[in-house]
Amino acid sequence: MTTIDPHPRGAAPFDTSGTFRDEQGVAHYADLPSSLVEMFRATVRDHPGQEALVEVDGERLTYQQLWDRAARVAGGLRAAGVERGDRVANLLPAGVGWVLGFLGTQLAGAVAVPVNIRFAQPEIDYVLADSGAKTVLRPEAPLPDGEPYAAGDLQIDELAAIFYTSGTTGFPKGAMTTHENFLSNVETVLRVHGIDRAEGPRQRNLISVPLFHVTGCNTQLLVQIALGGTTVVLPAFHVRPFLRTIVDERINVLTSVPAIYALALSQPDFADFDVRAVTRVGYGGSPIAPSLVERIKAAFPQARVGNGFGLTETSSIATYLPHEWATEHTDSVGFAAPVVDLALHEPDSAGVGELLIRGPNVVAGYWNKPEATDRTFAGSWLHSGDLARIDEDGLVHVVDRAKDMINRGGENVYSVEVENALASAPGVADAAVVGVPDDVLGEKVGAVVVAASEDERLSVPAVLDHLAASLADFKIPQYVHVRTEPLQRNPGGKLLKRQLREQTAWGAPVRGR
């Protein structure tokens, strides 16, 4: 097998102390807890009376209450026949019940299977069958309840959860997430943000994205449990409750997708909401316009901002763009995380190749998919499917998904580049770029554009003129479809381009070339 050399870390500013490499060359954090259960146990010991979990318009639990309730769920699962390593599917909505189900599964020594409740029924049925779930936690049934139980001998390399990918093509695949995967991501979040554990109990984090996705679960909920901070869960996103909760719950940590920030900042009375408590704003999941970064900084003047990039297969964060770099490098997803190695597979003359990722955050493979595992996780490297370049500073620039690159008569057009240009065009709130079949060129460039206002007609010529100032002619869309309804995205904020290709009626081209 060909040896792959990691790309130099460049100017990456993150702390890499207390790490080591195994015989395969994979880096690890040296002093992690042995499992999520031990991490949770330590926080309950140190901060039993600290507020742990708040469901907006629902229950509030301290860490001791959270442990006691989760231990009873674990006891109920064990009484129902769930054993170590069995899968427990979680179909509960976001809130206290979901968290108790997830933590109770961990305390039982079982494997959590968070299910995307937005999946169509055939997809849900597939996940339940493929995972071999022994028990399914459903909203219409009470949580399991029994004598308190907490597994005490779990190992760091044991399977802790199976997160099913959002399935932008075909049925989803189950990413096998170990305790080390979870714990490594927690440590990474602390290091890339420069968080002092002593400040943990003062943190109040609002989760506005799904808990069944790694951003909500791994990078927010579990990080706060590690710190002894408070997790506030918004059961469903609506912009007014989102803003009210920031104020009412004194939220100081936000992590969400760009579309949510854009919607919140577009509220005419945003200035009436006192958001001065917010000291950290994270974003990711989709490209972000430079203008939106500036608006976020202006709206949250006390906050450090940053862009996180990762996949279900990396347990969330693989790279991070910190505050000091966030304004001048909005086209970058940042530097490799402290224990993450990056490489480019078969880069072209422009330095663009498939992004390869290696680290203790990379999952153990796909459940029940040995061929897909061998193909995607070859030689300890995750083949991400993202096309990227890495500059001399070590900053990663994701230019497209490999399957979304448009080949226009032999010219490669990276859809993300065009989408970024569209994001700053007048009257454009959101945009997606896809290939449109063409008999002569093979593909032409098509853009689906969401108008910023339903009251004002979007000027397509003005948008094209804007693009001409920054893009080569062959990259400017020949087809533009304007709509007012939001674009379809998966729970991680990524565009569902297959649906857009299938559902968009393009009409006549807006330009001839």
Please report, for each region that a protein language model flagged, where it lies by residue.
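Conserved adenylate-forming
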Residues: L77-V82, Y149-D157, F163-I207, L227-G229
